[in-house]
Amino acid sequence: MTDAGKRILVMAGGTGGHVFPALAVAKYLAQQGWQVRWLGTADRMEARLVPQYGFDIDFIDIKGVRGNGLVRKLAAPFKVVRSILQAKAVIAEFKPDVVLGMGGFASGPGGVAAKLAGVPLVLHEQNAIPGMTNKLLSRIASQVLCAFKNTFTQVKAKVVGNPIRRELIALGGEPKQTADEALKVLVVGGSLGAKVFNDLMPEVVAALSKQQSITVWHQVGKDNLAGVKSAYQQQGQDGGVNVAEFIDDMEAAYRWADVVLCRAGALTVSELAAVGLPSILVPYPHAVDDHQTRNAQVLVEAGAAFLLPQAILDVNKLVSKLQLLANDRAELARMGQRARDVAVLDATEQVAQVCIALAEKG
């Protein structure tokens, strides 16, 4: 049976950790002849990003419920009912063969609307600890997928990894030059940057450069460029440091790096595994349910990463870890291989095949 003419409604939004894995699946299915439509919210990143990939997007009015004030929580049930009706209208008009929920505000109402409309619902959870929306929807979904083992305890879920871009998967097979060159450290704190990295790294580089040759590519986040550049200059380290507000080409950044200092978002952890890079992971301390620490454990337990909680992070600890890696390039290479060994490289295809199978069953 041909897949041409099949339709999928993709629900993902809010953060890159939801949107980019969903885009990988959407692109794959579009190449198979599927019609793809997106459900999101107008004030989040999907509104800008999804149309750039050529996909139509519909918006519903919904805000996060968790962690808000009392008045918003009291109003939440009415907002949820309204958004379910909006999502149901989109489903009635588009008539998808399957609905794929990958997180974000729109997934909850959209998932309920899919169930009410009798359309197969596939869920994918990117984090090691599921979000509230996916916990609830997992009870009504046709199929539950997850990136990491032991994510769901109340329902049966299939572990498929996190869908990531093909270009990054190919990058993992390239040899790394780790001989006597300067240690190349990629520092990534997300689109907003990470203040703790911005504050500490100028001192870290100054201390390390007295003993080691080191170069740094540092993504500092929006509005932080001038301040961090100045801090490096004050430490006399502006020569070997490339400071950027945002790194658009992560493929180039990963190809360049020997080691990555970063948060432990689900997509980041999966990308580090796929490209085969050692890492120093500092989980975002305010993440819901501390899910970034659980994400990080996948690489830490494999011997592919060091875990440094932000509460104990300081200049000396970062210098110590980077010094260790700079002095033992063989271990650096082994850590990279261990990262690659835990990667799930066909996650996009696995998620897509589940959607295809459910659509064909009707």
From Swiss-Prot:
GO CC annotations, alphabetized: plasma membrane
Disulphide connectivity of cysteines: none
Compartment list: Cell inner membrane
Protein name stated in the entry: UDP-N-acetylglucosamine--N-acetylmuramyl-(pentapeptide) pyrophosphoryl-undecaprenol N-acetylglucosamine transferase
Family according to the record: Belongs to the glycosyltransferase 28 family. MurG subfamily.
InterPro entries, per database record: GlcNAc_MurG, Glyco_trans_28_C, GlycoTrans_28_N
Entry-linked PANTHER family: GLYCOSYLTRANSFERASE, UDP-N-ACETYLGLUCOSAMINE--N-ACETYLMURAMYL-(PENTAPEPTIDE) PYROPHOSPHORYL-UNDECAPRENOL N-ACETYLGLUCOSAMINE TRANSFERASE 1
One GO BP annotation of this record: lipid glycosylation
Species this chain originates from: Shewanella oneidensis (strain ATCC 700550 / JCM 31522 / CIP 106686 / LMG 19005 / NCIMB 14063 / MR-1)
Function statement: Cell wall formation. Catalyzes the transfer of a GlcNAc subunit on undecaprenyl-pyrophosphoryl-MurNAc-pentapeptide (lipid intermediate I) to form undecaprenyl-pyrophosphoryl-MurNAc-(pentapeptide)GlcNAc (lipid intermediate II).
Pathway: Cell wall biogenesis; peptidoglycan biosynthesis
Gene from which this protein is expressed: murG
Enzyme class: transferase
Keywords: Cell cycle, Cell division, Cell inner membrane, Cell membrane, Cell shape, Cell wall biogenesis/degradation, Glycosyltransferase, Membrane, Peptidoglycan synthesis, Transferase
NCBIfam families per the UniProt record, alphabetical: murG
Major localization class: membrane
Membrane topology: Peripheral membrane protein
EC number: 2.4.1.227
Catalytic reactions of this protein: di-trans,octa-cis-undecaprenyl diphospho-N-acetyl-alpha-D-muramoyl-L-alanyl-D-glutamyl-meso-2,6-diaminopimeloyl-D-alanyl-D-alanine + UDP-N-acetyl-alpha-D-glucosamine = di-trans,octa-cis-undecaprenyl diphospho-[N-acetyl-alpha-D-glucosaminyl-(1->4)]-N-acetyl-alpha-D-muramoyl-L-alanyl-D-glutamyl-meso-2,6-diaminopimeloyl-D-alanyl-D-alanine + UDP + H(+)
Residues engaged in binding UDP-N-acetyl-alpha-D-glucosamine: 15-17, 127, 165, 191, 247, 266-271, 292
GO MF term set: UDP-N-acetyl-D-glucosamine:N-acetylmuramoyl-L-alanyl-D-glutamyl-meso-2,6-diaminopimelyl-D-alanyl-D-alanine-diphosphoundecaprenol 4-beta-N-acetylglucosaminlytransferase activity; undecaprenyldiphospho-muramoylpentapeptide beta-N-acetylglucosaminyltransferase activity
